[in-house]
């Protein structure tokens, strides 16, 4: 856990509360398998807490909240079948590599020349 004597304190009380919330969520996250729906939701919630702009965090939380509310408690430990479009996830990169056949080359995008 976080040691206040070794690490710097956040500059505001709100930052301190967010930091404690993130540490608590990371602790809970250890109890879920890494491919489960609960793990995905906890990861997204941690990302929301790390956002510095209030409006953006509020939007992301409002998008996440209905999914978490509708999820059954038993489903949180089962593997997640969510499609991620962020491009950062390893499973997304693997899928992109599999989708393109090896014998097909990429074509160049040609610019449109206007007729005058």
UniProtKB/Swiss-Prot annotation:
It comes from Mungbean yellow mosaic virus (strain Vigna). Through its interaction with host SGS3, acts as a suppressor of RNA-mediated gene silencing, also known as post-transcriptional gene silencing (PTGS), a mechanism of plant viral defense that limits the accumulation of viral RNAs. Belongs to the geminiviridae protein AV2/V2 family. It comes from the Viruses. One of its GO terms (biological process) is negative regulation of gene silencing by regulatory ncRNA. The keyword Ribonucleoprotein does not apply. Its main location: host cell. This is Protein AV2. It is found in: Host cytoplasm, Host perinuclear region. GO terms for cellular component: host cell perinuclear region of cytoplasm.
């Amino acid at each position: 856990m976080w040691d206040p004597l070794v690490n710097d304190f956040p500059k505001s009380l709100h930052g301190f509360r967010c930091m404690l919330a993130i540490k608590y969520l990371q602790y809970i996250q250890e109890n879920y398998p890494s491919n489960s729906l609960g793990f995905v939701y906890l990861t997204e919630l941690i990302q929301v807490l790390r956002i510095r702009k209030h409006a953006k965090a509020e939007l992301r939380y409002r998008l996440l909240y209905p999914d978490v509310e509708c999820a059954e408690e038993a489903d949180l430990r089962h593997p997640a079948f969510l499609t991620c479009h962020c491009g950062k996830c390893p499973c997304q990169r693997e899928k992109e590599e599999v989708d393109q056949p090896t014998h097909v080359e990429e074509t160049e995008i040609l610019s449109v020349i206007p007729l005058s």
